[in-house]
Amino acid sequence: MVPELMFDEPRPGRPPRHLADLDAAGRASAVAELGLPAFRAKQLAHQYYGRLIADPRQMTDLPAAVRDRIAGAMFPNLLTASADITCDAGQTRKTLWRAVDGTMFESVLMRYPRRNTVCISSQAGCGMACPFCATGQGGLTRNLSTAEILEQVRAGAAALRDDFGDRLSNVVFMGMGEPLANYARVLAAVQRITARPPSGFGISARAVTVSTVGLAPAIRNLADARLGVTLALSLHAPDDGLRDTLVPVNNRWRISEALDAARYYANVTGRRVSIEYALIRDVNDQPWRADLLGKRLHRVLGPLAHVNLIPLNPTPGSDWDASPKPVEREFVKRVRAKGVSCTVRDTRGREISAACGQLAAVGG
């Protein structure tokens, strides 16, 4: 029996309007509604995206008399950090966020020697029902607004600056949710993540990754948007028989359709596609599956594919676990033998349930 997929949010969220929900025209209109001069729109955007300030009361270049009015109209307190948990000697931090309506979701901030990455959520929960993923097993609560997505980025960037004197370099849509099932808001968020201040955070498009389980039409739409971000396709099996179980959306868009869409993305953007593959002991780690994976990827994507192997992270109630290291090494060897780049991901945050597939927004 195919698990029920949820593409439509069961409880549509209507968080209050925030500056981060608005494009340049929207910001200008909001400022005009407040009876403020037009230049304030650019000034507010610079404070938010450039200086990472989300409270107008701290914006000293604004007249004191209008700060409260601007705060109420354009800077509602969308998210509250309900809990922060760290591991990896403080280099990994998971934040449990509570939205205005009580919805809970998570983001993860990771510091590396040469980069700093925030892993953000696009939905509260997920409707794709992948059996090895805690988020998917919890179901979908609702889509996040553009501002709720961007607030995770701003908070991560501000934490790096204030706590470590460092800068945010990478953003990955690999937290809770299927980003392409919340397409319009994710697209708007990506545009503002990559735009230069005062229109956005100024993160390089090449340092932004959007992950998907394989919503083929949306992958093509993302290609046509020509944002130039990295596409990560969560494949997890090279054959439809197994992928139907591991990634139930495969019952709607087969592997061939997902890979064809990925090839279209690579052709349009010139970007290499990352193929995500959670390696599960005795489930998808057989030598013949490594051979088939390499063969299919080489045929469709050639040098524009990179396999990112992920040792399966434990989740509550699951008997599955990661493949032994010798099996993992053999899998890598066989994929590479087919002419496809393949590496094993450096897993972070496993002990605080912050790693891939572990986010469940519990506690707090």
UniProtKB/Swiss-Prot annotation:
Keywords: 4Fe-4S, Cytoplasm, Disulfide bond, Iron, Iron-sulfur, Metal-binding, Methyltransferase, rRNA processing, S-adenosyl-L-methionine, Transferase, tRNA processing. It is found in: Cytoplasm. Its cofactor is [4Fe-4S] cluster. One of its GO terms (molecular function) is tRNA binding. It comes from the Bacteria. [4Fe-4S] cluster binds at C126, C130, C133. The active site is at E106, C356. Belongs to the radical SAM superfamily. RlmN family. This is Probable dual-specificity RNA methyltransferase RlmN.
